[in-house]
């Protein structure tokens, strides 16, 4: 028995869902988890694998309908969870959420309170300083976990690699003011705590 409760790894064969390729493993027909590989992981004490997802690619909420490709993604995710489970391996969702929203996104038009600090490109941080924003995040996760039973859990980087909430528009050790009309009035820790609690 491993001394760690969860020994989680990224699949050696799985594609990376970021530039330059941005490949979504849940949309292609490739089996990234062959039985021999899963058996070897299980013998080595690995009991978790993570798959990169974006909430809006999978979830339906009271704010947004399900993406047209979501059912295909969810079906492959369910099959992967079931297959890995036969080897005692849980599938964990890896996310960088809440995801920033590009300028012109219909969600920003419908919910201007979600438009947070200006991002690095032509995007905006997802402002978590409103109850509707937090409800959107909670509904997204609840829907995904309801659609795919037996997931291991969620690994989320909410400050680091990309713009997420308004605090993430600043470097982690910055003393600068958060550039958002709502979040600039709040303690920085509170901004991050909201996203984590959702």
Feature map (PLM): residue ranges:
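Extended, regular secondary-structure scaffolds
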Residues: 186-198
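Feature activates predominantly on carbohydrate-active enzymes
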Residues: 1-159, 164-183
């Amino acid at each position: 028995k491993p001394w760690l409760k969860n020994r989680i790894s990224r699949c050696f064969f799985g594609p990376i869902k970021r530039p330059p390729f941005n490949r979504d493993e849940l949309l292609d027909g490739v089996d990234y988890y062959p039985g021999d590989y899963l058996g070897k992981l299980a013998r080595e004490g690995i009991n978790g694998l993570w798959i990169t997802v974006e909430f809006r690619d999978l979830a339906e909420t009271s704010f947004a309908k399900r993406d047209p490709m979501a059912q295909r993604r969810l079906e492959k995710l369910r099959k992967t969870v079931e297959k890995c489970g036969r080897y005692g391996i849980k599938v964990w969702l890896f996310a960088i959420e809440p995801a920033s929203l590009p300028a012109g996104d219909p969600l920003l038009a419908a919910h201007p309170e979600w438009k947070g600090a200006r991002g690095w490109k032509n995007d905006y941080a997802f402002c978590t300083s409103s109850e509707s924003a937090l409800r959107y995040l909670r509904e997204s996760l609840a829907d995904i976990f309801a659609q795919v039973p037996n997931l291991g859990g969620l690994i989320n980087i909410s400050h680091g690699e990309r713009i997420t909430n308004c605090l993430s528009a600043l470097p982690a050790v910055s003393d600068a003011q958060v550039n958002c009309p709502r979040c600039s009035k709040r303690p920085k820790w509170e901004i991050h705590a909201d996203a984590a609690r959702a």
